[in-house]
Amino acid sequence: MEYQNLFTQVQVVAPPHHGVSIDPRDERERFGEPVLIHLFGRLGNAQLGPIYLGGLGIASLFFGIIAIQIMGWNMLASVNWSPIEFVRQLFWLSLDPPLPKHGLSLFMPLNEGGWWMMAGFFLTVSILLWWARMYRRAIALGMGTHIAWGFLAAIWLYLVLGFIRPIMMGSWSEAVPFGIFSHLDWTAAFSLRYGNLFYNPFHMLSIAFLYGSALLFAMHGATILAVSRFGGEREIEQIVDRGTASERAALFWRWTMGFNATMESIHRWAWWFAVLTPLVGGIGILLTGTVVDNWYLWAVKHDVAPAYPYVFGTPIPDPATSGFMPPAAPAAPVITGVKP
């Protein structure tokens, strides 16, 4: 049967390597002897270690564990401290942001958003420290800082959702809850409240870059796997000496679409598409509720969407944005004098 490398891996077993020499102080902060693990080799490099955390890494883990502990214990308390219910309802449990009445106050009762504030603070500190660690490790190894800036694009979206936009809206209640299904429910309600995010042009761009990232990733991965029988996975060698693998890959794409990327440019395309996904998405979220109250009406005004006729009678204003409260439904009639 022909060798197919979609599922079949070849593991090269060699003596574990400690990595390039760096600053002596940093060398001392590496710990653990590298070992080879066969299961890891099925996913990537089989070597585990040595591990470098350093001061920033340890601090990041410390604050991150505190944040997760706050979320976890609050969720456990919400099911009356039952471990069984905690596991059973984990996907539905949530730590919610402060109530609207607290506005942008930094101090409120713990059960009215105080725990959320503390968890958010520690989680944000943890993420920022981890970013600083990634940046400093790249500098120490003489690398570019592309990975750190890519990570910062994701941090930007996180800060927009939980920090920047709530401040612009004047209330921490606008932030996202900590929870699996609860944050998905928040996303659905957020879109409905502001007239469907699909009409937000920055949301459109974000989805385009997201799908584009997936397409580029699939095209690049498939191309390299297709020419790995010629050594195409050794991309550094292919850059300086293209050889048979790179020539065939380039020729394939010129044949099929008239243009081909290079071994270097495909990674720049992939980096930009991936970075722009959360970057423009964050801009779209930031404009929602602060500049645009209803994206559908905005789209109609700018000839992006048609003005659909109302088919279910007169629309009722959203009480969350207009202050209008619909009248209560009439009480059910009470029938007296009839025995059950």
Region spans (language model):
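Cytoplasmic membrane-interface regions of multi-pass membrane proteins
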Residues: 33-43, 76-87, 98-104, 122-148, ...
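N-terminal juxtamembrane cytosolic/stromal segments of multi-pass membrane proteins
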Residues: 1-58, 75, 79-99, 251-254, ...
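Hydrophobic alpha-helical membrane-insertion segments
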Residues: 56-74, 147-168, 208-215, 276-286
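Loop-to-transmembrane boundary segments
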Residues: 37-60, 140-151, 194-208, 250-283
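Alpha-helical transmembrane segments
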Residues: 109-117, 199-217
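Alpha-helical transmembrane segments with an aromatic anchor "belt"
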Residues: 108-164, 177
